[in-house]
Regions:
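Active-site phosphate/pyrophosphate- and oxyanion-stabilizing loops and adjacent acidic/basic residues
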Residues: 12, 115, 152
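Adenylate-forming AMP-binding core of the ANL superfamily, especially NRPS adenylation
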Residues: 108, 147-162
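Structural detector for helix-capping/boundary residues
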Residues: 4-5, 30, 70, 161
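Conserved AMP-binding A3 loop
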Residues: 1-9
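Conserved AMP-binding/adenylation subdomain of ANL enzymes
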Residues: 8-25, 33-74, 88
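Thr-Gly-centered strand-to-loop micro-motif
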Residues: 23, 28-29, 54, 103-105, ...
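Gly/Ser/Thr-rich phosphate-binding loop
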Residues: 18, 47, 64, 69-77, ...
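Alpha-helix capping/helix-boundary segments
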Residues: 59, 81-82, 109
Length: 162
């Protein structure tokens, strides 16, 4: 069962894991009717005082333009969203250097894609595993683990209980 306590804590602890501050700007292109948007994005920003840069609907060009124009420091998405952004013919026209972090979740996250995102978008990828009923994140790679181990070595997000 989802409670205010676990939704608030999940958003807060995810932000802590990603070192969010009030200086961050999160580009939100995931749906707000889903736990990815409402907990990992909205609650994260509410508990850390971050700015949310809302994209009306997912369109790789709109996302790239929003990150570029607003100088976003974080970006969330599922693997297919990142593939669409990286493969967009106008990708090289946008400055992604303001990005420092983001979440890739919702599906298996290929290590090669995570490497491409880090190289081309300059952001450290946090791959979160969870489920809606857990509000939603349960595990994420420990911050000391290198990307090559991201697919196999995970740490439980703080305060997770049975």
């Amino acid at each position: 069962m989802l409670t205010h306590y676990n939704i608030s804590n999940n958003g807060f602890l995810t932000g802590e894991h990603m070192k969010f501050t009030s200086d961050d700007k999160l580009c939100v292109c995931v749906p707000l009717f889903h736990c990815f948007g409402v907990v990992l994005a909205t609650m994260n920003c509410l508990t850390h005082g971050c700015t949310q840069v809302m994209v009306e609907r997912f369109d790789p060009l709109l996302v790239l333009a929003s990150v570029h124009k607003e100088r976003c420091t974080a970006l969330y998405g599922v693997p297919t969203m990142f593939i669409a952004e990286l493969n967009h013919p106008m990708f090289d026209m946008f400055d992604m250097s303001s990005l420092r972090t983001g979440i890739m979740a919702g599906s298996l996250c290929p290590v090669e894609l995570m490497k491409r995102v880090e190289e081309k978008m300059f952001m450290k990828v946090t791959s979160v595993y969870g489920l809606t009923e857990a509000s939603p994140g349960m595990t994420a790679p420990a911050s000391t683990i290198r990307l090559m181990y991201a697919a196999t070595r995970w740490a439980v997000i703080s305060s997770l209980r049975k």
